[in-house]
């Protein structure tokens, strides 16, 4: 059962929920970070691969770092933010920013209003959440897209 943590601070577009990301509303699109090689062999990426498959479909999109690959599953979009070249590399804030911009653009073109994600880039990738969350706020500032971040 997901429970809301300290409802979004004044003016924040991010809502924090303690619970299972995959228990989010079925109408929410999902997002997480991967590498260009689409390995998804560790962290939450393993669960995305198991739940949504489509590795070849993602590889066929030939996306590079700073771009976003997309799968459509059950009427919603699953966003794969490409933040690094290989699974063994670490992402840069610059590539994360570019891939967030690419995702925002796809969301706006396709009528996505609700987006759920983990603390992207902050698990195995070691980016700092305070920087990542500020970046998400900035990228999605002028949109009506509601973002929910799930933590365990």
Curated annotation (Swiss-Prot):
It is found in: Nucleus, Nucleoplasm; Nucleus, Nucleolus; Chromosome. It is an enzyme of class 3 (hydrolase). Changing residue 123 to E: Abolishes enzyme activity. SMART domains: A1pp. Changing residue 125 to A: Abolishes enzyme activity without affecting ability to form a stable covalent adduct with the ADP-ribosylated substrate. GO terms for biological process: DNA damage response; peptidyl-glutamate ADP-deribosylation; protein de-ADP-ribosylation; purine nucleoside metabolic process. Changing residue 35 to A: Reduced catalytic activity. No effect on affinity towards substrate. Ubiquitous. The keyword Nucleus applies. The active site is at 84 (nucleophile), 125 (proton acceptor). Residues 2-152 form the Macro domain. Its EC number is 3.5.1.-, 3.2.2.-. GO terms for cellular component: nucleolus; nucleoplasm; site of DNA damage. The modification Phosphoserine is found at residue 4. Its main location: nucleus. The modification N-acetylalanine is found at residue 2. It is linked to Defects in OARD1 are found in patients with severe neurodegeneration. Defects were found in an extended consanguineous family with several affected cases in two generations. ADP-ribose glycohydrolase that hydrolyzes ADP-ribose and acts on different substrates, such as proteins ADP-ribosylated on glutamate and O-acetyl-ADP-D-ribose. Specifically acts as a glutamate mono-ADP-ribosylhydrolase by mediating the removal of mono-ADP-ribose attached to glutamate residues on proteins. Does not act on poly-ADP-ribosylated proteins: the poly-ADP-ribose chain of poly-ADP-ribosylated glutamate residues must by hydrolyzed into mono-ADP-ribosylated glutamate by PARG to become a substrate for OARD1. This is ADP-ribose glycohydrolase OARD1. It comes from Homo sapiens. The gene is OARD1.
């Amino acid at each position: 059962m997901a429970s809301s943590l300290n409802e979004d601070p004044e003016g924040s577009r991010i809502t924090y929920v303690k619970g299972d990301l995959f228990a989010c509303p079925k109408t929410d699109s999902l997002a997480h970070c991967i590498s260009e090689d689409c390995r998804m062999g560790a962290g939450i990426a393993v669960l995305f691969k198991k739940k949504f498959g489509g590795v070849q479909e993602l590889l066929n999109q030939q996306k590079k770092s700073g771009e976003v690959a997309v799968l459509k599953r059950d009427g919603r979009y699953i966003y794969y933010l490409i933040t690094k070249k290989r699974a063994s590399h670490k992402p840069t804030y610059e590539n994360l920013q570019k891939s967030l911009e690419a995702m925002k653009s796809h969301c706006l073109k396709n009528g996505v209003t609700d987006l759920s994600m983990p603390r992207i880039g902050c698990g195995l990738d070691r980016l700092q959440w305070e920087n990542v969350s500020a970046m998400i706020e900035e990228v999605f500032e002028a949109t009506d897209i509601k973002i929910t971040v799930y933590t365990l």
